[in-house]
């Protein structure tokens, strides 16, 4: 119902913008978005892609191999993050070869945490200041982004790779992100995401030997 309401409002806004506003050029976040809008609304104006560069500095990586962990940034109060984490908790985490610690950052109410029925070594840090968040970013093996819904470029993924942190995500969430640090499979199946995380853990943990 939440997504349906957003969908209806977004469609109404898009039609108004495209029909009433006279512009010389449309700028899109991803190639997929550009092609979709050109086809749906028969856009004849010039269309281009926005730069996906964020003004964030690389951080010094000091990976904690003694107590390794993965990082999932993003408040679960945001519907898309909750949906993705729920999928990860139920379908992905139980099938990993190594039961590794996972830290979820961002606002998280006790109600939402209980709804997730989290098992295993999955912990919630709550909201963090920049210094503490960057400490986790520096120490983690990498970022996991179990995102399966939403539109546009996923800022948390873009921010992570530009900080120099590897990210394992879904094919869906990788759209618009061109980085050697962004790892994903050929589809959005559970088995593919599980395989990508397992492969990443095997590669990364072997570096500590």
Predicted regions and their residues:
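Membrane-proximal helix-turn-helix segments that form the acceptor-binding/catalytic region
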Residues: 2-26
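Helix-loop-beta element that forms the nucleotide-linked donor phosphate-binding surface
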Residues: 18-29, 34-54
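Short acidic alpha-helix that forms the nucleotide-activated donor recognition element
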Residues: 19, 129-141, 162
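Conserved catalytic-core segment of nucleotide-activated headgroup transferases in glycan assembly
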Residues: 28, 48-131, 138
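Short alpha-helical segment that forms part of, or immediately flanks, the ligand-binding pocket
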Residues: 134, 155-162, 175-176
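Acidic donor-binding loop of glycosyltransferase active sites
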Residues: 137-152, 163-165
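Conserved donor-nucleotide binding/catalytic region of nucleotide-linked donor-dependent transferases
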Residues: 198-209
